[in-house]
Regions:
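Mid-to-C-terminal functional-domain signal that highlights helix-capping/loop sites
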Residues: 1-203
Length: 203
């Protein structure tokens, strides 16, 4: 409704990663202070157990168009030609996934190290859901192939080690940076209500 009906704002790529992972990737970054002038314990979760995969989200009336738990966490990737979803169940198991979305090559990383914000009442005691990243595997016009080996993400050509932020931290390609794709981490019910045409990755 209004003069700008049909327009869409440009999405800026972002990630959900732990503070340790953020600090390692961006040591000089500014961090918002917890001293906001309001009493708030940012380490507590008022919705303990909300993201239990066997739960049903409150206020959801629609049935999901896919045979998937509404509370399953998914990585949603959208291009102009295709919308695709990847469940955490699969990405945590595989750690690295190469695929195409709308004809564009992507690589998904999933590593341990970030606690769920909606599991335990005290967030630092919550289960480790891990952090994700979705990137273009093309670097300087060369298509790299990645694997999870020895607890690290490496590219097969040079053996360089890559972080969850898509930066090479060691090896011949050290300090090289992959381009982040537009994606997000969502509950399945939240993503699929807006994008019911999503093709779910099943390999």
């Amino acid at each position: 409704m209004g003069d700008y009906t049909g327009y869409e704002l440009t999405i800026i790529p972002s990630q959900l990663i732990s503070f340790d992972q953020f600090r390692e990737a961006y040591p000089d970054a500014a961090v918002l202070s917890r001293e906001t002038g309001h009493l708030r314990n940012y380490g507590n979760n008022p919705y303990a157990g909300y993201d239990d995969i066997n739960n049903s989200p409150f206020l959801l009336r629609e049935e999901l168009p896919k045979k998937i738990s509404p509370m399953e966490k998914v990585i949603g990737v959208r291009t102009e030609k295709q919308v695709k979803g990847y469940t955490y169940t699969i990405t945590r198991k595989k750690r690295v996934i190469h695929d195409e979305v709308g004809g564009e090559p992507i690589v998904i990383f999933h590593v341990d190290g970030m606690a769920s914000a909606l599991d335990d009442r005290t967030i630092h005691r919550s289960r480790d859901d891990g952090s994700t990243g979705v990137f273009s595997p093309v670097l300087n016009d060369e298509h790299l192939e990645f694997e999870f080996s020895g607890g690290e993400i490496r590219d097969k050509k040079t053996g360089s080690i890559w972080s969850i932020s898509g930066r090479a931290t060691d090896g011949p390609l050290k300090d090289a940076q992959l381009v982040t794709k537009i994606y997000g981490d969502y509950f399945a019910f939240a993503w699929l209500v807006f994008y019911p045409e999503t093709e779910m990755f099943e390999r």
